[in-house]
Amino acid sequence: WKSSNLAPERLPHYATISDLSPVLRTPNVTFINLQYVSFEEDLNKISNELGIEVHNFDDLDHYNDIDDVAALCLSLDLVVSTKTTVPFISAGVGTSTKLANWKQSPWNNVLSNLNGPKIDVFERDTLDPWDNVFTSIAHDILKYANKRRS
C-alpha cells in the first residue's frame, strides 16, 4: 500500500491502510503481509479497528530478501497491491495480481504500468478517492473465491 519512496510526487500512487478496508473485510480470506517498510503500525491498526489479522513472517526480510519474497508470492492465490515492487514480483512469479493504480496520462500508464496475463489493473483518476478501486478488487476476490470453491 506504500513505498519506501514517499516523495510528494509519488504519494498519489499509494493508499492508506484504511483505504484497503473493502478488501480486508472480504470474508473467508487469509491475509499475508508483503509490505516491506513501516508496516507494524498499520498491521496493529487493522487488528484493532477491523478485528482482522494480517499474518506477517517476522523472520522474512521483505526489503532485502527478494528470493524469499518471490517464493512467498508464488505460494499465494493472489496479491493485491498499489504500484510498488510487490506486484512486479508477484506477477513475475505467476501469481494473479490485482493492481490498484493511479490513472495518469495515457502515455504514462502505457509506459510504466505492469502488463501481462496475471495482472488486473483497477484505476482511479487523480482527484478520486481509492474507495471504488478497492471495492472493485474486493468483488473480484469474492468471485475468485467462489469459483475456487465450486
Please provide the spans of the model-predicted regions.
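Catalytic machinery of carbohydrate-active enzymes
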Residues: 1-150
